[in-house]
Amino acid sequence: MSKEFLWVEKYRPNKVKDCILPDTTRKVFQGFVEQGELPNLLLSGTAGVGKTTIAKAMCDEIGASYIVINGSDEGRFLDTVRNRVRQFATTVSLTSGASHKVVIIDEADNTTNDVQLSLRTAVEEFHNNCRFIFTCNFINKIIEPLHSRCTVVDFRIKPEQSTQLQGEFFVRLRSILTKEKVEYDDKVLAKLIKRYYPDWRRLINECQRYAATGAITSAILVDVADVNLDTLLS
């Protein structure tokens, strides 16, 4: 399936400032971009909150070449991970504008201990020309030797930040649907946001699925709860 067909890829932000995150979290990543240098990072948080998106956005902004290895599939095979990392780390990039390449290990908590130990070694072996960004849902599944070699950023959202983030995504979602020429009902969008928050990836995927019927209206929901639209729009 084409990435351009998938809305989560088509509308994935490629700048940190466009990522929907708590201000304090976004400022941390913006600081790395402004320095033009990334540390080794361990990004921890629930599914769909934007960990991989922010990793790619930082690489795009600083002009770093990067690869993504998914820990849930190929990332479970020691030789595959070791060979891909070594091949990427030792190859000269003619297009990168950054001083380091970046290896993104997505869902690193689904890799085996042997793979994580190998990655720990790679972090040290290739520190002169590579940085590593690990994403995980469960930080306790990351071995301590790998954990200790990374700057940890927690994507946990505080209750007082929820309303602002839901409002930002409400605006983002309306923009996507308008560009895709999909009719929608504001109240239904608000209901969907409340239902899937904070899994933005799931929300966009569900909206694309519903949009296949021609419109996102109350007809797609068995029950539409009352939601204060003014709160989302404020």
Predicted regions span which residues?
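P-loop/Walker A NTP-binding region and its immediately flanking N-terminal helices
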Residues: 1-169, 187, 191, 205-208, ...
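A short, charged helix-loop
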Residues: 168-180
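A short helix-loop-helix "switch/interaction" segment in the helical subdomain of ASCE P-loop NTPases
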Residues: 178, 187-201, 221, 233
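AAA+ ATPase "lid" subdomain C-terminal helix
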Residues: 182, 194-219
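Loop-to-helix "switch" segment enriched in basic
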Residues: 213-234
